[in-house]
Amino acid sequence: MAQEVLKDLHKVRNIGIMAHIDAGKTTTTERILYYTGINRKVGETHDGGATTDWMEQEKERGITITSAAVTCFWNNNQINIIDTPGHVDFTVEVERSLRVLDGAVAVFDGKEGVEPQSEQVWRQAAKYDVPRVCFVNKMDKLGADFYFTVQTIIDRLGAKPLVMQLPIGAEDDFDGVVDLINMQAITWRGKTEIGTDGTIEEIPADLQEKAEEYREKLLETVAESDEELMEKYFGGEELTIEEIKGAIRKLTVNSEIYPVFCGTAYRNKGVQPLLDAIVDYLPNPLDIGEVNGTSLDGEETLTRKPSVQEPFSALAFKIAVHPFFGKLTYVRVYSGQAIPGENMLNSTKNKKERVGKLFQMHANKENPVEHADAGNIYAFIGLKETTTGDTLCNPDNPIILESMDFPDPVIQVAIEPKTKADQEKLGTAIQKLAEEDPTFTVQLDEESGQTVIGGMGELHLDVLVDRMKREFKVEANIGNPQVAYRETIRKKVESLDYTHKKQTGGSGQFAKVIVTIEPYNPDPEELEEGESATYKFENAVTGGRVPKEYIPSVDAGIQDAMQYGFVAGFPLVNIKATLEDGAYHDVDSSEMAFKLAGSQVLKEAVAKAKPVLLEPIMAVEVVTPEEYMGTVNGDISSRRGQVFAMEDRSGAKVVKAKVPLSEMFGYIGDLRSSTAGRANFTMVFDSYAEVPSSVAQEIIEERTGSKA
């Protein structure tokens, strides 16, 4: 029998578990589920039995791809956990999870410290202001170094860690932790069976001095956060445990500090204190307080408090296909209450929805509930129009909550069904997968007639194609990966005049526009909410020379024309268009005429604006033994890469470089063979940059030649 969802929001935690791939976050989640009584048998990532890894591909690959939502209970508190992927190709899963969470556990590998993907996920968490506690995992690993890992949190993340525990021993001799608040040791000696509670002991004599030093630092941090505590502490009085914990909680909720704990989830050491920390220090929905949104017309700012007395509002953050129920929509309810069979409004799309069943989820198992209340995470069944990032609300009190930004895909492949039956199944598969994943894109290449799918990396597309085969039984031929090139302009073209005129008897078509286009590279920090970083349209028409009902048509026409660039037919980006003037005709002007004028003026302007080709550049980090440094650097140079930093890490060398994505296909095989399998690498998308003319010529010839 499933435990009831708690109504007291003080006792609810909505948290994510985030990390670099292989830092051990799925294993940490599995242990949490075991200790909280959800799992009778513990799952292991390496044998494909992890509860939160429920897709076939996840079980095979031993990595987490989708964010499974799991509800569990610890000491009469409810913890809703989202297990997020650590592989860079799946950053969208991390992004959409963080948007709806109140707090997170950042898991670090005790040997590697902060790794590239940890940095990216940390930045994403900072973007959504998510408070975090840190868990230094794998303390039993050869080379594990707790103090090094804490230093990397300072050096690489620019964060302020607050050490809450010290490790007792390391590697095979890791036996437990020193609890710096209670000044006692908690030990799990020898091989610890799953479910074993730690033993409370005296602090080992050889750690006593270090423990006192770190407790002093902890107390100073606490005292400095509050005037009363400062007076008490510097006046020589003892601070109580409640005062210390309360101050740390406040600092954590405000993201001023990040408490650090340690252990080894796989060896069952340190998990229970981490659960206590989640409850003690991470915020509940009431700490987060009200959320902001806008009215349907975007004119008015509205707020919703985390209370069932408020009008219903929720954000859909994930779509999944359930084998029995069909489409599952994961939602975070921010205010009010929903019940099965109720009508609601999808305010993002302005469409009515009716919710069927409501579930509290445990990975891919579901527990039906009779109502979905403010502050909790649920899965809704029966929503037809809702996709990721949409707001659901009470139709009588509409609100649009802040949505999510998703990056454009950087890699594409052509996909061709093998038979006519596969063609129909492919259409269904693509539609379902695109609903689930906003970074999965589909387009028809008009000249070749091929269906082209796009994603965030080779692994991302591999998994999607694999799912088409397994879940939708689609047999298809897949082309080689193609880079998602873009085009832009380098020169401003002012006041270009274009008149669209057609007279064929009866009413004709007439629209005149005068437009300036220029390069557009805004500072992301200065963008308003919802503003694009790659396109801006400004209306500077005065005196009604173009009626206001036709202005959006000019904008739409310009955006349509940006889908096919002048250089090689790739989409145009980083353009600002200003409509300065124009003219209309009472009878012959229409929305369509102004849309066509917008398209044509853009095409003519781009031709004069020095159009260039852009390519995605990846930030690459290679970890290699020192003897292969020369080989690695030489190989990066041969791929048009630029090395911008080198550093030492855990006895190895780290090479940081920026390399065009087009040069990185097959890199893992080349790197392994040239370093006897001893080096590895990670890469994340960095930016778009202009393609050198010699390389651009090849791309243009290949693109236009293949279409000839």
Swiss-Prot record:
Protein name: Elongation factor G
Keyword NADP: no
Matches recorded under Gene3D superfamilies: 3.30.230.10, 3.30.70.240, Elongation Factor G (Translational Gtpase), domain 3, P-loop containing nucleotide triphosphate hydrolases, Translation factors
Known role: Catalyzes the GTP-dependent ribosomal translocation step during translation elongation. During this step, the ribosome changes from the pre-translocational (PRE) to the post-translocational (POST) state as the newly formed A-site-bound peptidyl-tRNA and P-site-bound deacylated tRNA move to the P and E sites, respectively. Catalyzes the coordinated movement of the two tRNA molecules, the mRNA and conformational changes in the ribosome.
Disulfide bonds: none
Organism whose genome encodes this protein: Corynebacterium aurimucosum (strain ATCC 700975 / DSM 44827 / CIP 107346 / CN-1)
A single GO BP: ribosome disassembly
Domain tr-type G: 10-286
Matches recorded under HAMAP family: EF_G_EF_2_B
Any Pfam family: GTP_EFTU
PROSITE patterns xref list: G_TR_1, G_TR_2
GO cellular component, one term: cytoplasm
Key word Nucleotide-binding present: yes
Single GO MF annotation: translation elongation factor activity
Binding-site residues for GTP, renumbered to this chain: 19-26, 83-87, 137-140
Protein family according to the UniProt entry: Belongs to the TRAFAC class translation factor GTPase superfamily. Classic translation factor GTPase family. EF-G/EF-2 subfamily.
Subcellular location: Cytoplasm
Alphabetically ordered keywords of this record: Cytoplasm, Elongation factor, GTP-binding, Nucleotide-binding, Protein biosynthesis
NCBIfam families: EF-G (TIGR00484), PRK12740.1-5 (NF009381), small_GTP (TIGR00231)
Lineage, top ranks: Bacteria, Bacillati, Actinomycetota, Actinomycetes, Mycobacteriales
Highest taxon of the lineage: Bacteria
Predominant subcellular localization, coarse grouping: cytoplasm
Gene behind this protein: fusA
Listed InterPro entries: EFG_II, EFG_III, EFG_III/V, EFG_IV, EFG_V, EFG_V-like, EFTu-like_2, G_TR_CS
